[in-house]
Design a protein with these regions (language model features):
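CoA-thioester-processing core
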Residues: 55, 75-128, 162
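Acidic, divalent-metal-coordinating active-site segment for phosphoryl/phosphodiester hydrolysis
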Residues: 76, 132-139
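Well-ordered beta-strand positions
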Residues: 87, 127, 131-133, 148, ...
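Intrinsically disordered, low-complexity segments enriched in small/flexible residues
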Residues: 180-210
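A structural preference for short, pocket-lining loop segments at secondary-structure junctions
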Residues: 2-40, 58-68, 87, 91-95
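Hydrophobic/aromatic residues within transmembrane alpha-helices
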Residues: 21, 33, 81-83, 140, ...
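A short acidic, glycine-rich active-site loop
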Residues: 39-50
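C-terminal long alpha-helix characteristic of the crotonase
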Residues: 3, 90-95, 143-192
Length: 210
């Protein structure tokens, strides 16, 4: 799935518009396939998780605004996709947002930790990440997973409204500001994943800086 989404992102313009991510009704994302992780095939598990971590890095650093329309439960990697987006809208309902890795016998690697620290509010980070607390949709705003909650029938209407508004933000100035804000986090993520450092285009001198 991560490889498929990565391929789709190749066709998304990165110099105009905005990126809107959503899931199916009742489920935004449940994260990695635990059966793949638990079936005892280390190669398959490593390939799947590495592709997922690279996808998170790509969404987090996408040059245009990223809007997440959480259509239901956002669990494990799904919770971290919310952390990658620039504006997060959740559908009201009996849904949870939970980073449940430590409850499932999994440690959380550096790339995900860095993303979570940049989005989860400090007074909720231990509860949300280390203690794997499940948050209701309404409580997810206070934790830092979501920015806004709306009725389910209004989710895509609101998401498109926000996406259209943020699409008007100037390029490359939005990208330049985002790059500077994320530089330290992305450097730690790319070092952990063995990815090359991404140069940053200076808005003043128009040169690339690393």
């Amino acid at each position: 799935m991560s490889n498929t989404i990565n391929s789709l992102l190749d066709d998304v313009p990165d110099d105009k518009g905005s990126l809107l991510i959503t899931g199916r009704q009742g489920l935004f994302s449940a994260g990695f396939d635990l059966k793949t992780i638990q079936r005892g095939d280390p190669k398959a598990a490593i390939e799947m998780t590495t592709a997922g971590f690279k996808l998170l890095s790509r969404i987090y650093s996408f040059p245009r605004p990223v809007i997440a329309a959480s259509s239901g439960h956002a669990i494990a990697l799904g919770a971290f996709v919310l952390c990658c987006a620039d504006y997060r809208i959740g559908a009201k309902g009996n849904f949870i947002v939970q980073a449940n890795e430590t409850r499932n016998g999994m440690s959380i690697p550096t790339p995900i930790l860095e993303i979570s620290k940049s989005r989860i509010l400090k007074n909720h980070w231990y509860r949300a990440i280390l203690n794997a607390e499940a948050y209701s949709i309404s409580d997810s705003i206070d934790a830092g997973y979501l920015d806004e909650v709306v009725d389910p029938e209004e989710l895509m209407v609101k998401a498109l409204e926000v996406a259209k508004d943020l699409a008007t933000l100037s390029h490359p100035h939005y990208k330049l500001t985002k790059d500077l804000d994320q530089k330290d986090v992305l450097e730690k993520m790319r070092n952990a994943l063995g990815l090359p450092r991404r140069p940053i285009l200076c808005g003043r001198c128009r040169n690339l800086h690393t």
